[in-house]
Amino acid sequence: MAPKPKPWVQTEGPEKKKGRQAGREEDPFRSTAEALKAIPAEKRIIRVDPTCPLSSNPGTQVYEDYNCTLNQTNIENNNNKFYIIQLLQDSNRFFTCWNRWGRVGEVGQSKINHFTRLEDAKKDFEKKFREKTKNNWAERDHFVSHPGKYTLIEVQAEDEAQEAVVKVDRGPVRTVTKRVQPCSLDPATQKLITNIFSKEMFKNTMALMDLDVKKMPLGKLSKQQIARGFEALEALEEALKGPTDGGQSLEELSSHFYTVIPHNFGHSQPPPINSPELLQAKKDMLLVLADIELAQALQAVSEQEKTVEEVPHPLDRDYQLLKCQLQLLDSGAPEYKVIQTYLEQTGSNHRCPTLQHIWKVNQEGEEDRFQAHSKLGNRKLLWHGTNMAVVAAILTSGLRIMPHSGGRVGKGIYFASENSKSAGYVIGMKCGAHHVGYMFLGEVALGREHHINTDNPSLKSPPPGFDSVIARGHTEPDPTQDTELELDGQQVVVPQGQPVPCPEFSSSTFSQSEYLIYQESQCRLRYLLEVHL
């Protein structure tokens, strides 16, 4: 197919970068933090600490809300420790104060005190809480962190068991055995839903980020606790810009962050967050945490208990929660062949991902948002690689503006025309003998492209008169091999050729091109690919 006419572009070298930034736009990092803070606190399910000897006694429970998990990290002294306090009550109205403490990631030591009077047990609990935090238990809703003391963190237990318990008037409690309906999804989609909602996958993702999964149990990641992590990083970001008189040191601020968001460093000293690169890594980590919370919250949607004998298959239920239609493409379909060629021609020469399945994606509400750009031309199908832990969140909410790749081209949504570029951001999971990952293809309304050849992390929008920013790399898929797909009446360019050198950008700081848009509505998810990495 003949090459397409080149869109009107402007190329900017390093000497023209300064002073070209458009007006201030909302910072996505801070907007995510504000959104988390606005969410009402979840109703807590409090369980007896599983390491407590009394936890196996069915009559033992936590008295009211007398339960707390405390954390303290001090980098200078290599402290990274927790303290758990619970007031327990058994069926005979005897009371127990359970204390457990130690280094994050370990079982630690414990102590148990028995009481016959509730008031004595309360006094013991409240005394220990004040001793460890310098706060009164009655004023815990207005908790203030103090240097050298523990900080109260919000952790939530997993949901109650899945079997339904139905109360019958004037009779004993009986359990209804539910008959699960057969799954209506095809086998490939069943596997997809299983993978993207896998608790083991979420757990492994958190462990890879050195997070202490015991302090952030799956199913109930505290939104408020994540929001406090955002606040701690904002303070670090300000401190990295330059020291202020009387301000806290980076070590102190880092210690506070690790206290708020518990990390498991084993016996290693927690590293101070003392560079923009480390700060960016922790920002990305919290954004992934927020997406894990979204996926987990979908599954925790409360349903009124019904005494019905049949219930939807769990995979059908999870699929419906996505509010996104996924249509598995036949391997003989023309668009399947086009996408397969796109993958194979632009994938890595050393280890190109092996295509397994393609789904056509139709996310609820995205079509209407995308319609706002119906008159914007120059549309291209582009790659977006991601962590499996955030696939469910993306299918539910679409691609959002998040810092990626160190923010080399500012705060926008990043795409690539070469699969090998986006594949570098794919984090998958082991499934049998294969390492499985997922990649998106999005239709991006590029409009007028503004080209750059050096980093510009301050960008929050294209220059006036432009709709997108392309960080041009040394190579680009051969434009003479491009083809088009018609998607909802729009012609969308799909590269089909191998990458070829771009002499005019041979001195670019980017080896491969990165495509940036700064409005979330300017792209639409079109395809989801399952690949073996």
From Swiss-Prot:
GO CC, sorted alphabetically, is: centriole; centrosome; cytoplasm; intercellular bridge; nuclear body; nucleolus; nucleoplasm; site of double-strand break
| Location of region: Disordered | 1-30, 454-482
Reactions catalysed, as given in the entry:
L-aspartyl-[protein] + NAD(+) = 4-O-(ADP-D-ribosyl)-L-aspartyl-[protein] + nicotinamide; L-glutamyl-[protein] + NAD(+) = 5-O-(ADP-D-ribosyl)-L-glutamyl-[protein] + nicotinamide; L-lysyl-[protein] + NAD(+) = N(6)-(ADP-D-ribosyl)-L-lysyl-[protein] + nicotinamide + H(+)
Question: What species is given as this protein's source?
Answer: Homo sapiens
Q: Where is this motif: Nuclear localization signal?
A: 14-20
**What GO annotations for molecular function exist for this entry?**
catalytic activity; NAD DNA ADP-ribosyltransferase activity; NAD+ poly-ADP-ribosyltransferase activity; NAD+-protein mono-ADP-ribosyltransferase activity; NAD+-protein-aspartate ADP-ribosyltransferase activity; NAD+-protein-glutamate ADP-ribosyltransferase activity; NAD+-protein-lysine ADP-ribosyltransferase activity; nucleotidyltransferase activity
Q: What is its EC number?
A: 2.4.2.-
Q: Could you tell me which residue ranges the PARP alpha-helical domain spans?
A: 182-300
* Lineage: superkingdom: Eukaryota
Stretches assigned to the PARP catalytic domain: 313-533
Q: Which InterPro entries match?
A: ARTD/PARP, Poly(ADP-ribose)pol_cat_dom, Poly(ADP-ribose)pol_reg_dom, Poly(ADP-ribose)pol_reg_dom_sf, WGR_dom_sf, WGR_domain
The alphabetized UniProt keywords are:
ADP-ribosylation, Chromosome, Cytoplasm, Cytoskeleton, DNA damage, DNA repair, Glycosyltransferase, NAD, Nucleotidyltransferase, Nucleus, Transferase
Please state what the protein is called.
Protein mono-ADP-ribosyltransferase PARP3
